[in-house]
């Protein structure tokens, strides 16, 4: 199966993505497929400080409970509150309405992330 891996995003080996232009973070299409139907998402609060690769939340599916990791260090500037009542958005639109948080971050942190080609190779 082929998964969508947008070229304009950066990725973690743990399957989170970040949009370098906006700081928006989510999980990849591959990750949501592996998880199965998402039934609950726990996220940080606006204003919380995150360190790169530290836990930023939890996603619970019918198959598993998985930790979510911060692709960069920074301050949470927005949280996708829609996921409280519609966690299935993570499955339906992992790169769209299923985003998790937005982070104000230092672009130097992107050096420790994967580009789309490297991420595609990881999930192949």
Swiss-Prot record:
Described function: The glycine cleavage system catalyzes the degradation of glycine. The H protein shuttles the methylamine group of glycine from the P protein to the T protein.
Protein name, UniProt field: Probable glycine cleavage system H protein
Essential cofactor(s): (R)-lipoate
The keyword Transferase is assigned to this record: no
GO BP: glycine decarboxylation via glycine cleavage system
Subunit record text: The glycine cleavage system is composed of four proteins: P, T, L and H.
Gene Ontology cellular component annotations, sorted alphabetically: cytoplasm; glycine cleavage complex
Keywords: Lipoyl
Modified-residue entries (N6-lipoyllysine), positions: 63
Pfam family, one: GCV_H
PANTHER family: GLYCINE CLEAVAGE SYSTEM H PROTEIN (PTHR11715), GLYCINE CLEAVAGE SYSTEM H PROTEIN-RELATED (PTHR11715:SF3)
Span of domain Lipoyl-binding: 22-104
HAMAP family: GcvH
Family recorded in the similarity comment: Belongs to the GcvH family.
Cofactor binding description: Binds 1 lipoyl cofactor covalently.
CDD domains: GCS_H (cd06848)
Gene: gcvH
């Amino acid at each position: 199966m082929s998964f969508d891996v947008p070229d304009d995003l950066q990725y973690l080996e743990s399957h989170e993505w970040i949009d370098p232009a906006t700081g928006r973070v989510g999980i990849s299409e591959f990750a949501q497929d592996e998880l199965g139907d998402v039934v609950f998402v726990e996220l940080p609060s606006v204003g919380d400080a995150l360190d790169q690769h530290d836990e930023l939340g939890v996603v619970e599916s019918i198959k598993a409970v998985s930790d979510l990791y911060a692709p960069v260090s920074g301050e949470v500037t927005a949280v996708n509150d829609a996921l409280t009542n519609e966690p299935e958005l993570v499955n339906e639109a992992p790169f769209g309405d299923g985003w998790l948080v937005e982070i104000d971050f230092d672009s130097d942190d992107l050096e420790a992330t994967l580009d789309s080609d490297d991420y595609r190779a990881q999930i192949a």
